[in-house]
Amino acid sequence: MIDRFRRIVDVVAAAAGLLVTSPLLLGAAVATRLSAGRGVVYRQRRLGLAGRPFELLKFRSMRHPAPGREGPEFDAERMTRVGQWMRATSLDELPSLWNLLRGEITLVGPRPLPVHYWDRFVGDEYERFEVRPGITGLAQINGRNAVDWPERLAFDVTYVRTRTLRGDLRILIETVPAVLGRSGVDQADGVTMHELPADRSRSGPPTR
């Protein structure tokens, strides 16, 4: 019943969000095209509920990489000024309202991570896939990208184990000042978010 209520809220929020922000979506699309070139909407395969992959939609915030200049360490040089501003204000996330409408993500939950991370989690970190990934979550109101991986994943597991509707409402409310204050957008060295290390000790991922 609670999950059904969450889904109803997601659909209403997505539909209302797409309607209200349609002029902003158009303006952001034009600005992205002028600053980053072709491919206004960036599609990346992410891990969803139970580890099932889906395509997350975002506005492109970086120029296409030059040969040999790919990876998080080159984020700063590829980031456009428009993209930097949109990422700081989370406007690059607006296209993900379509993912919300389709039920691939929810308003509150662990952030969806790239599919190639599946083998890199340790032990109970896989509990984060027991719920749909979210637009915002416990880690996002406690440091966002500035939080290191072990702490960030611990926040995700804590959320899954303790989530309530009241807790979701608190996270949504606290997301507003976190976004407006543009806190935790990048890590200390200027990288948006370092890769989750591939050599973490583990017993192996569960079967999807």
Model-assigned labels for residue ranges:
Residues Y42-R78, T136-A154:
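Short, glycine-rich, amphipathic interfacial segments at transmembrane boundaries or analogous
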